[in-house]
């Protein structure tokens, strides 16, 4: 039994499907009735995630056209489960015949085999990045809910292959204006790398071309910011907001580390440097800086939510790598065929945004049941 495919408490999401199966999809349960939602709302987010958009992504071409099967009537959510489906159109399973019994280094081939005794070797099966189609579709629904509360989410690539973008130091500021965040998002979306720094984006692309020519891959850093998040979200002690965000982001394939706010830098700061001073502004409590990343004690403060994640290099590379043949019991060398992203961070951005949206939507619904007044 594979029991880890459902996420959330009140706003619950179950993804299903494999990379080379007939289709892939998601069921969203717990979305309140009365929210305007169309296939175009979902398609807009899926188009940002889909492969084949630039030289920075895999050459697999999938339209990723979504079909909403239930939960919507005349463009309005009904409060019943929302089921969404995307057909797989461009799978080339023959590319994977040679690795049926030879687990690829860096992939989940070996661990899925050990756990279940059987695995779908075609494109990674359930462990493929293709699974994130369902996450992004569900995230589109969550974002429609969050828009009712004025929440905005934006993600971007801040580092790729050791090349860093020149960006504001968000932790040094207690707030981020909506216009500034939307500008960052627009600049990121205009870049094939999804990096809002045009000069850094150009250097990243050049590096990516070089790495691809070498038959190799590179990783990077993705950041996600959420503003307009109301204070009070989070359920201590085990369902803290930052704990759920970390789980959500770590559940994305290739993500190897997550930071909230100052993150690992906080280990090098003194308390006087780490603590965010409070002050009154227009009758409301605000913060002079945001090392906490918008969360204290597992509960949102109302300041921007700041998340960063380290994304490892794509494990599928053309270079020869040592592995084993699980039938013959011998050591062998393989080079991975197929169409793969030379670097994953640009495509992880909409997935990471979706996971943050799912967590915030879930906690907004939970908070509405936490107190009467």
Curated annotation (Swiss-Prot):
Its cofactor is FMNH2. One of its GO terms (molecular function) is FMN binding. NADP(+) binds at residue 49. Residues 42-61 are annotated as: Disordered. Pathway: Metabolic intermediate biosynthesis; chorismate biosynthesis; chorismate from D-erythrose 4-phosphate and phosphoenolpyruvate: step 7/7. GO terms for cellular component: cytosol. InterPro entries: Chorismate_synth, Chorismate_synth_AroC_sf, Chorismate_synthase_CS. It catalyses: 5-O-(1-carboxyvinyl)-3-phosphoshikimate = chorismate + phosphate. GO terms for biological process: amino acid biosynthetic process; aromatic amino acid family biosynthetic process; chorismate biosynthetic process. FMN binds at residues 126-128, 297, 312-316, 339. Reduced FMN (FMNH(2)). This reaction introduces a second double bond into the aromatic ring system. This is Chorismate synthase. The lineage of its organism: Archaea, Methanobacteriati, Methanobacteriota, Stenosarchaea group, Methanomicrobia.
């Amino acid at each position: 039994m594979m029991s880890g495919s459902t996420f959330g408490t009140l706003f619950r999401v179950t993804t299903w499907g494999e990379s080379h199966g007939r289709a892939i999809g998601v069921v969203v349960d717990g979305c309140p009735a009365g929210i305007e939602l169309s296939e175009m709302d979902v398609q807009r987010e899926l188009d940002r995630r889909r492969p084949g958009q630039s030289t920075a992504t895999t050459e697999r071409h999938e339209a990723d056209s979504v079909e909403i099967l239930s939960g919507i009537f005349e463009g309005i959510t009904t409060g019943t489960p929302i089921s969404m489906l995307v057909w797989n159109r461009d799978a080339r399973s023959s590319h994977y015949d040679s690795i049926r019994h030879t687990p690829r280094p860096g992939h989940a081939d070996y661990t899925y085999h050990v756990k279940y005794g059987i695995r779908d070797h075609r494109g990674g099966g359930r462990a493929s990045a293709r699974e994130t189609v369902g996450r992004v579709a569900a995230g589109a629904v969550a974002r429609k809910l969050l828009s009712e509360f004025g929440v905005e989410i934006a993600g971007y690539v801040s580092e790729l292959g050791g090349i860093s973008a020149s960006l504001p130091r968000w932790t040094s500021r207690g707030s981020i204006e909506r216009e500034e965040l939307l500008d960052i998002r627009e600049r990121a979306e205009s870049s094939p790398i999804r990096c809002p720094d045009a000069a850094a984006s150009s250097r990243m692309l050049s590096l990516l071309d070089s790495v691809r020519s070498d038959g190799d891959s590179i990783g990077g850093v993705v950041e996600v910011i959420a503003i307009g998040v109301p204070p009070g979200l989070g359920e201590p002690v085990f369902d803290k907001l930052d704990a759920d965000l970390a789980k959500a982001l770590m559940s994305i394939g290739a993500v190897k580390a997550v930071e909230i706010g100052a993150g690992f830098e906080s280990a090098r700061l003194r308390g006087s440097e780490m603590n965010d001073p409070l002050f009154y502004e227009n009758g409301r409590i605000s913060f002079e800086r945001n090392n906490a990343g918008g969360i204290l004690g597992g509960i949102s403060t109302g300041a921007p939510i700041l998340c960063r994640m380290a994304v490892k290099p794509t494990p599928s590379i053309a270079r020869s790598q040592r592995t084993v043949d699980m039938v013959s019991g011998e050591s062998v060398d393989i080079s991975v065929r197929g169409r793969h992203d030379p670097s994953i961070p640009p495509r992880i951005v909409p997935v990471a945004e979706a996971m943050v949206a799912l967590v915030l939507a879930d906690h907004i619904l939970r908070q509405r049941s936490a107190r009467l007044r």
